[in-house]
């Protein structure tokens, strides 16, 4: 069984036991989070939401909070001696999907 959930402005396909990296959530490591924005549930029977599946939830355990690798952002305007170099590390949350209730 799998589901498509909406979190952090993105739609993510998840299965039970899977480890996923999502946009940062306000939860500590070891806590359990529940997603109620379930857009689709697949498996033996298919349920499509309009826009979400009524009564469907996905439960996950927070493994850790972290920051992704650094990317370099560079702005440059030719002939004007204008440039700006900046680094950015996006925060993320690592989850393990425990249960899909449909």
Swiss-Prot record:
GO terms for molecular function: rRNA binding; structural constituent of ribosome. GO terms for biological process: translation. GO terms for cellular component: cytoplasm; ribonucleoprotein complex; ribosome. Keywords: Ribonucleoprotein, Ribosomal protein, RNA-binding, rRNA-binding. The keyword Aminoacyl-tRNA synthetase does not apply. It holds the Pfam family Ribosomal_L21p. The keyword Ribosomal protein applies. Belongs to the bacterial ribosomal protein bL21 family. Part of the 50S ribosomal subunit. Contacts protein L20. PANTHER family: 50S RIBOSOMAL PROTEIN L21, LARGE RIBOSOMAL SUBUNIT PROTEIN BL21M. This protein binds to 23S rRNA in the presence of protein L20. This is Large ribosomal subunit protein bL21. The lineage of its organism: Bacteria, Bacillati, Bacillota, Bacilli, Bacillales.
């Amino acid at each position: 069984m799998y589901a498509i959930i909406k979190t952090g402005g993105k739609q993510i396909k998840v299965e039970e036991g899977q480890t996923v990296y999502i946009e940062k959530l306000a939860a500590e490591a070891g806590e359990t989070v529940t997603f109620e924005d379930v857009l689709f549930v697949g498996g033996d029977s298919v349920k499509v939401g309009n826009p979400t599946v009524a009564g469907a939830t996905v439960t996950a355990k927070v493994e850790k909070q972290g920051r992704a690798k650094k990317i370099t952002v560079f702005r440059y305007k030719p002939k004007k001696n204008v440039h700006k170099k900046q680094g950015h590390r996006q925060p993320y949350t690592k989850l393990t999907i425990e249960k899909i209730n449909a």
